[in-house]
Amino acid sequence: MMQTTVRGEVVEPYAEALLSLAQTHNLIDQFQQDTQLMVELVASSGELQQFLANPLIKPEAKKNVLRQLTVDKVHGYFLNFLMLLVDRRRINFLSSICEHYRALVRKLRNVALAEVTSAVELNDDQRRAVVEKVKTMTGAADVELVTACDPELIGGVVIKVGSQIFDASLRGQLRRLSVTLAQAT
């Protein structure tokens, strides 16, 4: 319940406001890059996460650190947005806001996000085949792939799009076979 409230009252409105700003100034792609940069910065530094979330640190100190980290790396409007988040004491929701912004852009552009796990790294032909499969499954105009490797799959792929999971892995096939055999006895 608490996460739903935070999402509805903080994350969604700020992400929607950022998208509105991006649309007004034709900066959707630029803000895509800026949000990705910020998500990566925050994810890669536990110290930065703690610093931004600490209510005892003065807002001006947080702004200075953000300016130093993003100088010449993000658009000025996006930097102003970061400063607004600090002023409104919402900067600790930065990663969630950025991720929601990226989801809104995908929805706007009819792009599906596919999380693909395979036993080995996919080559270009395999990536194209997965993209086409996801387009067929979802009716999306394009697909954004997030890939990961899991040798325990033995072979094949597991594709997750939203709440749908397409398991074409050897491990999944063996599991289904064992369930079928167990039910038969």
From Swiss-Prot:
A UniProt-annotated Pfam family: OSCP
InterPro entries registered for this protein in UniProt: ATP_synth_OSCP/delta_N_sf, ATPase_OSCP/dsu
A GO term from the CC aspect: plasma membrane-derived thylakoid membrane
Species of provenance: Thermosynechococcus vestitus (strain NIES-2133 / IAM M-273 / BP-1)
The keyword Magnesium appears for this protein: no
Location relative to the cell: Cellular thylakoid membrane
Protein name (Swiss-Prot/TrEMBL): ATP synthase subunit delta
GO molecular function, one term: proton-transporting ATP synthase activity, rotational mechanism
Function summary: F(1)F(0) ATP synthase produces ATP from ADP in the presence of a proton or sodium gradient. F-type ATPases consist of two structural domains, F(1) containing the extramembraneous catalytic core and F(0) containing the membrane proton channel, linked together by a central stalk and a peripheral stalk. During catalysis, ATP synthesis in the catalytic domain of F(1) is coupled via a rotary mechanism of the central stalk subunits to proton translocation.
NCBIfam families with a match to the protein in the record: ATP_synt_delta (TIGR01145)
Record SUPFAM superfamilies: N-terminal domain of the delta subunit of the F1F0-ATP synthase
HAMAP family (alphabetical): ATP_synth_delta_bact
